[in-house]
Amino acid sequence: MKEVSVPAIKRIVLIAHDNRKEDLVNWVKTHREILSKHQLYGTGTTGKLISEETELPVYRFLSGPLGGDQQIGAKIAEGDLDIVIFFWDPLTAQPHDPDVKALLRIAVLYNVPMACNRSTADYMISSPQFTKTYKKILLSYNTKVKKD
């Protein structure tokens, strides 16, 4: 196990499937004051929409189906993102479903909190840990991965 310090100013990635974008934008508007104190990231379309609707700066990766989910997964693996807010659509098949599953796996692997709906996002943002430095524990999977 390894302890990693998560800074008080969080690096938060905001993602939403098409049918959930409006819900995510409304959630960001509700929590604009808190979110304005953190660094925001997003997939291409979602990030642009949030930035336009809230006037918050959002660094944008590619659109999810064009590789944005994979870019975000890489940033999580590199320790460059702290929180994932991903309002995904459970009723619509996505062309990049394997990428979404990989992103979920990487978030769990690196112990990055992920909210997949508004209720979980509300609990997360209202946590006292949200605005403080936080020590997270990373499990060592090196011994679990078979080496060739």
UniProtKB/Swiss-Prot annotation:
One of its GO terms (molecular function) is methylglyoxal synthase activity. Residues 4-148 form the MGS-like domain. The keyword Lyase applies. Keywords: Lyase. GO terms for biological process: methylglyoxal biosynthetic process. SMART domains: MGS. Its EC number is 4.2.3.3. The keyword ATP-binding does not apply. Belongs to the methylglyoxal synthase family. This is Methylglyoxal synthase. It comes from Leptospira interrogans serogroup Icterohaemorrhagiae serovar Lai (strain 56601).
